[in-house]
Amino acid sequence: MNYCFLVFLVYLVFAVNGEDIWKVNKKCTSGGKNQDRKLDQIIQKGQQVKIQNICKLIRDKPHTNQEKEKCMKFCKKVCKGYRGACDGNICYCSRPSNLGPDWKVSKECKDPNNKDSRPTEIVPYRQQLAIPNICKLKNSETNEDSKCKKHCKEKCRGGNDAGCDGNFCYCRPKNK
């Protein structure tokens, strides 16, 4: 009960500040039972980056302090010196607020007719900008795909590459 109240207070503080937040699912198990304890933690958007964590903590017995320490050290290393935390699957790295997180960009406008075909691409946080996209890809038969890309190219002010997923334009800045 106290934990839920604390999470609510943290959420309220961020909501009042008007900043985007991510709800991070912490899936480390507890006790000796194989059950996921889904503890939610609020982390500011722009203060974290998701990095695939090869150090897994999820298993059928309690984690030793040594294992947890090893995981945290691993995450600190992949976070390149920034403070890192792990949930057994992903390292969460604290970064300066002027650097955004990596985004897994869904390239849905690549083949909007095929629901199973959703290629994804990791766009580095230093090479991206998201702009709300007024062009929605609801009707792919009327050449919406090329219209969307053209719209995004204009919005991205002629950057080297502009992609869209129907909700956002993803812009890479020009090479210098």
UniProtKB/Swiss-Prot annotation:
Q: Where in the cell is it found?
A: Secreted
Signal peptide residues are 1-18
Domain of life, per the record? Eukaryota
Asked whether the UniProt record includes Secreted among its keywords, one would answer yes
Q: Which UniProt keywords apply?
A: Allergen, Secreted, Signal
Q: Name one GO cellular component term.
A: extracellular region
Q: Say yes or no: keyword Signal present.
A: yes
Instruction: Provide the protein name.
Output: Salivary antigen 1
Q: What is the organism field in this record?
A: Ctenocephalides felis
